[in-house]
C-alpha cells in the first residue's frame, strides 16, 4: 500500500520526523518497505505565468514568451512546447536552477534569440513521464512561488508491506489509527454530515443471499455533471497513492476507498434495467467487466443483477454495461458488506485482482457503511453537483463479534515483562478497543473493522505492539548445562550419512509419495498407503521402498549424458500394519521404518589412465555394505533370494545375526529396459536400525610371534556356498581350544572343471588360506599341521568335502 505522508498527517500529525514515523510503524507490525520523495531534488524552479507569446523570427517550431516570474520584470523565454499560450501558468527554471539529473540552467541564445531560463514539462522535473507539453499549473498559484512549496513536492511517499490479517490498515484512516495509538496524538477521522435529501427516488434492492452479502446500502443521485474536473488536491493524492485519475465520479469512489477503506461502486442509473438483486450467479451467466474481460460465471461467484441481467461481480468489479461515462447524469451509489469467505479467491479464478476484492476478502468495516455513503455523497455533490435521494440501508446478516478475554498473568508470561494494568488499559483505549475489567482479566469486544482479533494471543500481540518490542528486555533462555549422552554402541543418522558419503555416494532426497505403478513394479505392493489429497495425480501413494526413486534419478541423469552415479537416500517408508496404534511419532495402521538405500551405476571407479575401465558389479556394492557395518560385518550373510525390483539370479537377501535387514542386487532386466539404461544399476536397501547398532572394538595385546600361513583346497558340491564352509570353520575355532591360534580364514580361489558334452559339473574346488599365530610362543610345524587337520576334518564332516590333491 502506497500513500503520501501529507495525507496521513492530515488525519494525525505527531511531532516526530518522517524516519521516526516509519520506524515506529515498522516496529508495530506495519512494515514500511520503502520511503521515497514525491519529487526528485531540484532547485530554482518557480511558478510563472505566460503574459505574451510571439513566433520566433528564425524558427517555425519555437516561440518567444514573455513571462511573469514574480520578480517585477518580465523575462524572455524561448519555448517549443505546443501547449504554450498566453495566460498559462507553468513552471520556470530560472537562470542558475539545477534540474534532476544535474542539468544546470543558464542564459542561452536559441537561433539568435536570448532565453533567460527554461519552461518545464513534468518529465523535466521528474514528476511523471509526460513530456508532450509544459506542465500546466493551477491559475490560482502566485508567480514567483517556489514550485516545491506550491505543489508540496517535499512530501514523502510511504510504501507499507502489510500482512493479510491487517485489512483495517488498507486505508489512510487505518494507518492513522495506528499512529494515534503509538504516539498518543489525537486522531481527526474523515466525517460528513448527512446531506439534505431533495428527491424521493429509490432503487429497490433484494438481498437473496445473506451468506454472500450481510449489508447493502445505496442511494440515487440525479443531475450530476460527470464532466466536472477532479480537484487538483484529490488528483495529487490519488496519483501519489498509485491511482491514476479517470473521471470525477470514479476518482471520488477511489479516493474514499483509499482514505477510509470503503470500496464502493457507482452505477449509471439510466442503464439499469430493473430492480437490483444480490445473489449467487447461475450456470451459463456471463459478464463483461470494467477491465474489458468477459467472464463465465457459476454458483460459487456472487453477483448484483438488474432483473435477470448481471451488472456486477459482487465485491470484485463492476460491469461495463452500467459503467459511468462523461455523459452520465443519474447514478446509483452502492456500498456493501460482502462476507470475506464469499469473495476470497474469486478474482484469482479469473486471473486478475482488484482493489475492492483485495479488501473485501480480508474483511471491511460493516458498521460505518451509512457514514461512508454520506461522505461519498458529499464529495459528489460538492464536485459534480446533483440531488441526493434517501439512503436505503439493509442489514440481513452481520458478523457477531464475540468478546475476547485476556488474562493479565498470561500476558506477562507470554511477553516476559510485567506490563502495568493501567498501561494495558491505556493501550486498549488508544487502540479503540472497548473493554471491561473483570478482576485481573480484560474482556475486549473487537471493533467492526478489526477482523484479526479472535483469541487471547491477538490481544497480547496488541499490547506488545503498542508497548514496544524494543522495551521488552533481552532475556537469554536459562537451561541446565547438561551434555547430551551419545552412546558409543549406537550411531545417529548423520554419522551413517557420513559413512556412506565416505564410500563415494552422494545423498539425494526424494518425495515420500510416488506413482502407484512404482509400488507394484519395484516393491510388489498392490495395496500401498494412498493419499487423500495428492499434490499431483500421479504421485498418489506413499512409498514402501526407496529403490524406485533412486532409479528414477539415475534415469534422469543418464538422459543428460551422466555416465557414472553413486547415490544414496536415508528416509522413511510406509507399510500397512493393522496392529500399530497411534503414538507420539506413530499413525495408527501405518508403520514408518527408516531405511537406507543406495544405487551404483557406471564405472566401478572414476575414469583414469591407470586403471582399466569396468562396470560396477554386485561385489563392489557388497563390499561397500560390509564397510558400513565395520566390526559387525562378519555377522552379515548374503543369501540368494528374489525381490520384485531385482534380477532373479543376481540378488540377495541381507541378514545380520540371522535376521533379514535388507536387499542387494542388480536391477531387474525389465525395469532396466523400461528406464532405458544400457546396463543394470546395482541397488541395495537396508534397515537403518541395523546400521545404527555397532559393536565396540575389543582391545587385545599384539603378538610378537611370527605368522604362519597355510592353504587348504577342497572338493565340494558345486552348489555349496563358500560362506557355509567359512561358518563351519568359525564354529570349529569357537569350540576347539586347540584352534585358538587360527586368526583368520579366507577363500582365495574357486576352480571348476570344464563341462564335457552331455555332462553336468557337480563339484568345484574351493581354496582357503589360514593365518595362524600364537601370542606366547612360535608355532612349530606339528602344531600348524594339527590345526589344519582339525579344520579339514570339520569341513569333511559337515560338507562331505575331500581334499584336493
Curated annotation (Swiss-Prot):
The record, for HAMAP family, names: Phe_tRNA_synth_beta1 (MF_00283)
Q: Where is the FDX-ACB domain?
A: 703-804
Assigned keywords, A-Z:
Aminoacyl-tRNA synthetase, ATP-binding, Cytoplasm, Ligase, Magnesium, Metal-binding, Nucleotide-binding, Protein biosynthesis, RNA-binding, tRNA-binding
Q: Which residues form the B5 domain?
A: 399-474
According to its UniProt entry, one GO biological process term is: phenylalanyl-tRNA aminoacylation
Q: What is the lineage of its organism?
A: Bacteria, Pseudomonadati, Pseudomonadota, Betaproteobacteria, Burkholderiales
> Cross-referenced CDD domains, in alphabetical order?
PheRS_beta_core, tRNA_bind_bactPheRS
In the UniProt record, the gene name given for this protein reads pheT
Q: What are this entry's molecular-function GO terms?
A: ATP binding; magnesium ion binding; phenylalanine-tRNA ligase activity; tRNA binding
Q: What is this protein called?
A: Phenylalanine--tRNA ligase beta subunit
What organism, scientifically named, is this protein from?
Answer: Bordetella pertussis (strain Tohama I / ATCC BAA-589 / NCTC 13251)
Q: Which cofactor does it need?
A: Mg(2+)
Q: Which residues make up the binding site for Mg(2+)?
A: 452, 458, 461-462
